[in-house]
């Protein structure tokens, strides 16, 4: 059953949690957005080896729960692995969660939480 229009009508932005190259490319493509003051929240998080998993989880929570203007959340698959317990338990329709490859880490369909759910659904 489709979600009511009220669930998605204000969700007009993408958010990204990724490495520097992925985030930079998406920002150059025009997805960057900062909310109005006083909180001025960005719709992206650049993750490197020094980024704590807690910071990644906090951004994931903010983009999926707190921000009602995010329609799609893109996350590098190798970063999703760092918070796999949160990604695997995420079931909301909005924002849609998509795992994407990065320059240094190719996409592995065996790790993708959405594809695993589809396989379970079809009994594979």
Curated annotation (Swiss-Prot):
Statement: the UniProt record of this protein carries the keyword Disulfide bond: no
Topology in membrane: Peripheral membrane protein
Keywords linked to the UniProt accession: Hydrogen ion transport, Ion transport, Membrane, Transport, Vacuole
Superkingdom of origin organism: Eukaryota
Single GO MF descriptor: proton-transporting ATPase activity, rotational mechanism
UniProt cross-references to InterPro entries, sorted A to Z: ATPase_V1-cplx_f_g_su (IPR008218), ATPase_V1-cplx_fsu_euk (IPR005772), ATPase_V1_fsu_sf (IPR036906)
Key word Transcription present: no
Location(s) in or outside the cell: Vacuole membrane
One GO location term (cellular component): vacuolar proton-transporting V-type ATPase, V1 domain
PANTHER family to which the protein is assigned, alphabetical: V-TYPE PROTON ATPASE SUBUNIT F, VACUOLAR ATP SYNTHASE SUBUNIT F
Task of the protein: Subunit of the V1 complex of vacuolar(H+)-ATPase (V-ATPase), a multisubunit enzyme composed of a peripheral complex (V1) that hydrolyzes ATP and a membrane integral complex (V0) that translocates protons. V-ATPase is responsible for acidifying and maintaining the pH of intracellular compartments.
Subunit structure: V-ATPase is a heteromultimeric enzyme composed of a peripheral catalytic V1 complex (components A to H) attached to an integral membrane V0 proton pore complex (components: a, c, c', c'', d, e, f and VOA1).
Family to which the UniProt record says this protein belongs: Belongs to the V-ATPase F subunit family.
Full protein name: V-type proton ATPase subunit F
Source organism: Botryotinia fuckeliana (strain B05.10)
UniProt lineage: Eukaryota, Fungi, Dikarya, Ascomycota, Pezizomycotina
